[in-house]
Amino acid sequence: MEARIILLRIQIPWSANRQFSHPPLDFPRFIRASSSSTSQKPKTYEGPKPRKNLVADFISKNDDLVRSLPIYVGGASLLAVLFNRTVSGIAPVADASSSQSRADLLALGLAVTNLLTGLVWLSIRPKSITPVNPKGVECKVVESDLPASMVSELLWAWESLKVATCCKSLVIVYNGICLIQIGMVAESPEDKKTVIVKTDKLMQGSVYRGVMKSKAQSYLANLSLYPGRSELPFLPANTQAVILQPLGDKGIAVIGGNTIRGFTSSDQAWISSIGEKLDATLGRYFVDSDEISRVTV
């Protein structure tokens, strides 16, 4: 009430000549929104665009021409030197006291070097590395005694490897039991059935014992070059690369890929992290199982 009385007592002086400021004419007073499709522009990427390397693009598209270019340059240089000696009237026999002869000999040496370089470039070509289709059959074998949580954990590991890497086959052996065999597997030539993992034979092999002894990840970047290939008969015949990841002291994960040197350093680190997680989960499960079996006995 007191506040109202105070406001009523305040008198604002009124002047008839007072001028009120008007907004500038160019100031937009109204903003209209239109929902018509013609006024909407398609959204495009407006950030920095990657620069194109024109030289690299030209070389990749004209590989044969670039490799044979030193031959053309060397041949043209050789013909130019011979034509110069013929036209200039210099004796065809090289004279050590003549500066022209010494320059021609140097030019001939460079021309021959270009010719040899071109021949080497044409004869030596890098082998293109492309993914292959594994020769085998799809397989999904999971240990029946595992609880649903463990099966979900193993399937998560498989999906993670399949999506993020070139993994096409996965075998996990822990505590002497093959917990899961999933992905592409070899096919038996006799009965056309899948080749199941034989844990006893695998654990007796030098590959398994070497990994468990070193307790470190083993990366076979080109599987065909390693004699231990015969110890992994359950993998497809054309498996290109294999990673052997130890799972603590009691297990191993065999990961097969379809590309030579297809597993990058980040893939190997990711596989190591998955291996540590699986080792912790499987270790707790088997410890609990042993305690339960002891109590029941």
UniProtKB/Swiss-Prot annotation:
Stromal side: 34-70, 125-297
Top-level taxon: Eukaryota
Organism annotation: Arabidopsis thaliana (Mouse-ear cress)
UniProt-recorded name of the protein: Protein COFACTOR ASSEMBLY OF COMPLEX C SUBUNIT B CCB4, chloroplastic
Biological role: Required for the biogenesis and accumulation of native cytochrome b6 in the thylakoid membrane. Controls the conversion of apocytochrome b6 to holocytochrome b6. Required for covalent binding of the c-type heme to cytochrome b6.
Compartment(s) of residence: Plastid, Chloroplast thylakoid membrane
Key words, A-Z: Chloroplast, Membrane, Plastid, Thylakoid, Transit peptide, Transmembrane, Transmembrane helix
Observed phenotype of the null mutant: Seedling lethal when grown on soil. On agar plates supplied with sucrose, seedlings grow very slowly with a chlorotic phenotype. Deficiency in the accumulation of the subunits of the cytochrome b6f complex and lack of covalent heme binding to cytochrome b6.
Gene transcribed to yield this protein: CCB4
Pfam families for this protein: CCB2_CCB4
